[in-house]
Amino acid sequence: QVTPMVSLGATYQTKTKMGKLDKYKGLFAEQGGFDIPANYGVGIAAKINDATTLAADVQTIQYSGVKSIANPASNTAPLGADNGSGFGWSDMTVLKLGASRQYGNDLVLRAGYSTGKQPISDNQTFFNILAPGVIEDHLTLGGTWTLASKGEVTVSYMHGFKKAVTGSGATTGINLDMYQDSLGVAYGWKM
């Protein structure tokens, strides 16, 4: 906390080693390896008044450190080999903006937006049919209502705006597009 109104933060997560996906050892590079990539970021939150907080984060995801994600699909090595085809994703930097507003003691409403540069190039669409993660922009809305019984209900909604990547070169005609919607409801109880 820099001042009573402003907080700064930084994060770093190393690559997380996952067990081999044995059923996919002939598909994913490194005999079915599929680790979670390292990522790092910085953020700031400003308490505008007693009820309102605004926040901004910048995060970089290092897809290049995981061969099954980063290796280009144009490799001539066999599928599943250490240098075999992957999804061809580039590292990605994501900007996130958020706001939170407290209404009395019982209700908090939240909104957020994130945007990032496309990690999939237009010549890497073939292998990405399996995981067409092409969305660049997301909007989130949510709120938490505290109940008299010490319980709380949280509702959240996320919309990933439609994005398309049109294949080129050897992947001409293999086009990807995606949008997402997600709705969540959770109940919690405070002891």
Q: What are the residue ranges of the model-derived segments?
A:
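Outer-membrane beta-barrel porins/channels
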Residues: 1-191
